[in-house]
């Protein structure tokens, strides 16, 4: 299958390209500056020219805190650009797998969020991603929107890698205990996205590491697996204020007949550590 991966130089995109190539697909890997997805005309022309069977859109503005001060850019990249890709896929007869986020939810539930739950993002990042979802649904029937959560991997900035770095610089760290989610290793999600590109079912899917934990528990697991001695002190989101609000509970579940099933998040942490050994510059 001819597969186009957008955002191919990013943390998730690189894993999707690798997974697709391992499976023997013909892969086109796009990222800036070769193709600017915010340019509707250029995106349409490029995808029509390539004629892929499917597109996996990993391109995104992912700085949750920075989005609060620059919502226009976040909306352009996460929203309008996603609509441009969907419109181009419709013209080219391609299926679209579009990656979204748990931050479309407000965190008010205390049980896993399913695909049909009402969305109500708390911040600019979540609003921008929800705008992208809306445009994809409006522009292209043959789509799969895959919401994931707390993504980490060796090829980009992420919470787990940051905490591992801090452990080499400090004797102790403070981490919040009152935000709970589904940590997801990019290397586990990527093959599921490639598989979704080959499927025919459409709509919204949730794809995240199995299980749940707080940021505090995730840090403890990472330090234990890495064998580091840095102390982890509990704190709260109120005490550890950040520019962007985050949902208190964004664990993802699924109501789909054929759900995306990923390994437990703890396995993802161990796989991440192993992958970091192969990417020493990270």
List where the protein language model places each region.
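Catalytic helix-loop patch of NAD(P)-dependent Rossmann-fold dehydrogenases
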Residues: 69, 76, 81-84, 104-146, ...
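N-terminal Rossmann NAD(P)H-binding glycine-rich loop of SDR-like oxidoreductase domains
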Residues: 2-22
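Adenosine-cofactor binding site in Rossmann-like domains, unifying the SAM/SAH pocket
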Residues: 21-45
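NAD(P)H-binding glycine-rich loop region in Rossmannoid oxidoreductase-like domains
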Residues: 37-79, 90
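NAD(P)-dependent short-chain dehydrogenase/reductase
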Residues: 134-181, 187-188
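SDR active-site strand-loop-helix element
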Residues: 6, 30, 58-59, 96-101, ...
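A short helix->loop->beta-strand "cap" motif at the edges of active sites that frequently abuts
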Residues: 92-94
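Mid/C-terminal beta-alpha module of Rossmann-like enzyme folds, strongest
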Residues: 192, 199-244, 248, 273, ...
